[in-house]
């Protein structure tokens, strides 16, 4: 049995009016700024230049180590400076519209971010997956997606916009809040989390969107997440998943240096063109070449290849043989993902016996090929199932909501 908490207020009109006021009063967030950007912003706000380096150090500690979301809690900063910071900036968390808890302990949050410019509030989903000794947060990089992968639920939602570095990091910060993963924060009773250490040990850019189509903001967010003075996550514990944006794979290795995962799903171009249409632009030969040249590959730093198991589509023994041949010489792990059904799909999950035969062949060839245990299926939180709640509404409901938003924004 799953549990769902609808955290929205009852009166939608009041909620939309609040968003309208927020858009008019919008202040830049310090969350997600690089040190250079923060220095420029602080000087512009009136912080003496000689103090800027010290103030940045203090702010990073409070934002990313202590996890505060109110300037008033920054106790080693003077009251006057806290007031000045609050006047010019925000460090508020996004609205948590809904929290769903699966029977297996997986948690899914629906976040709502305020309007940007003349836009509307947007919603995205993040998922927390607890396991023995680790807790993984699946983070979104876009509202919707442009890739239209035929087996993926997110691919049925049109791209609304890219998320900012602030909005990407806000998913991690808010999840840590709600799991009690910051000092002085309590873990919810009964929550499934690692028994010791951090509640969130790993992050994966595998939520809504294609991270490499939002490269600069994703890069900024991940460099802060891995900064020793920031959230201090090892780059070995951060995985970026891409459907194959080849030029940015090279940039990811050179400029970010996190672990790489490839949404592969097919070993023949003619099939991958259908399942993952970006393959028409960057076919398998180009994709695999970029993988072979990814910096620092070794048995300790392997590329993960994700392969969704689709009945009678890509699950034959011949597909397994071609997969092994395709990846020959690349330090790799192959995650076999039982297809997670969603409303309206025409695909079916492979038979379990066939998945095991496929895995056995790949294992025998020397590649680790774990079969991923489906997590959070009962709350549509499993791989390929994410989609903004507002996008699940009937068209008439969505148009009514948008009309109210327009009225609330005075457009």
Swiss-Prot record:
GO CC, alphabetical: cytoplasm
Entry keyword annotation includes S-adenosyl-L-methionine: yes
Keywords associated with the record: 4Fe-4S, Cytoplasm, Disulfide bond, Iron, Iron-sulfur, Metal-binding, Methyltransferase, rRNA processing, S-adenosyl-L-methionine, Transferase, tRNA processing
Residues in Radical SAM core domain copies: 131-380
Binding site for [4Fe-4S] cluster: 145, 149, 152
Pfam family, one: RlmN_N
Entry-linked InterPro entries: Aldolase_TIM (IPR013785), Methyltransferase_A (IPR040072), RlmN_N (IPR048641), RNA_MTrfase_RlmN (IPR027492), rRNA_lsu_MTrfase_RlmN/Cfr (IPR004383), rSAM (IPR007197)
Cofactor dependency: [4Fe-4S] cluster
Family designation: Belongs to the radical SAM superfamily. RlmN family.
Database matches in NCBIfam families: rRNA_mod_RlmN
Record-given protein name: Dual-specificity RNA methyltransferase RlmN
Encoding gene, per UniProt annotation: rlmN
